[in-house]
Amino acid sequence: MSRKVLFQLVLPLIGLSILFWLLAFAPGERKNQPALLEMSVILRDGDGAVSTMRRGMEQAAEDLNVELRFLTPTADNSAAEQAHLLERETAGGTQAILLLPADRGVLGEAVSAAAGRTALVTVETDMTEWGAGAAVTMDHQALGEALGEAACNGVPTGDTVLLLDSLPGDNGIRERMLAARETLERAGRQVRIYQWSADTASFTDILRIERPGAVVAFEAAVLAEAAEMARSNESFPLLYGCGSTPAIAAALEEGRVTAIAALNVFSAGYLAVDAAAALARHEDWTGVPTVAFSIVRQENMYDNDNQKLLFPVT
């Protein structure tokens, strides 16, 4: 037998041996990986403020062999449309669902119905009382109080603080605002609530009329918009709020934002997928820890712990 023919016979055998080794012994132990799990994620809106949380979800999905499908209402923060999406995904047999609720009052019935048919985890707003299997949230009461106290440090007694109400309804974002209002009023500050919208002219008018000493936003997207307005307005009030996006970190560094409640939203996204996957697969599960936050100012934004909150993904 010629050397050439022998080579042609042996080469495929070597290839098959390598393939067998990869399948049987390669890192990751593919043969022990859990079966692929389909999971739907129902967002409140399509804003980029959830991008860090989404990266956390995607990292968990890669680690846990989960296929994610992101769904967004056509109208931002439409709880009614979220309820429709929840009913549709449940009826379609989705194995697990993550939901960022816009309004408990509107979504309660749909959540209760879905929770009996699929693994359902809510993010940001707790709906375990309606039957959700778990909730990945932060302490909204403590967060709102902390922002209220921060604003008190910058605004004298008797002066006005303007709170931006960006998500009407029964939800975690509103819990933050109500806690901040209570803290400010108890400390002797005047509180005004402004219904946030895309109408920047209206907001400018409110600032001119009320002349607040500080403005507080309770969502990252709203804080980022207000910080951008402050760029071209030297008389803009002190600005406080929730969020830890790159745009907000830049505004904090430049002094356009006075202080923020920085949230570990990457961790929130990861924990949500992890919890839903464990519930869907009927695995042993110890519960979800409360998502951490920290009040961050320009002078301490580069502390190690705060860096992890501001820049959780490199």
Listing of model-derived features with the role each one plays in the protein:
Residues 7-24:
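Hydrophobic membrane-insertion alpha-helices, especially the h-region
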Residues 25-53, 63, 133-134, 160-168:
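Short beta-strand segments enriched in small/hydrophobic residues
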Residues 38-56, 60, 69-80, 104:
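Extracytoplasmic "Venus flytrap"
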Residues 49-64, 143-147, 168-190, 225, ...:
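Short, solvent-exposed amphipathic alpha-helices that sit
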Residues 98-116, 196-249:
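Hydrophobic alpha-helical
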Residues 104-142, 245-253:
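Flexible loop/hinge segments that line or gate small-molecule binding clefts
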Residues 135-160, 244-248, 263-281:
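Hydrophobic alpha-helical segments within soluble ligand-binding/sensing domains
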Residues 267, 271-314:
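Hinge/cleft segment of the Venus flytrap/periplasmic-binding protein
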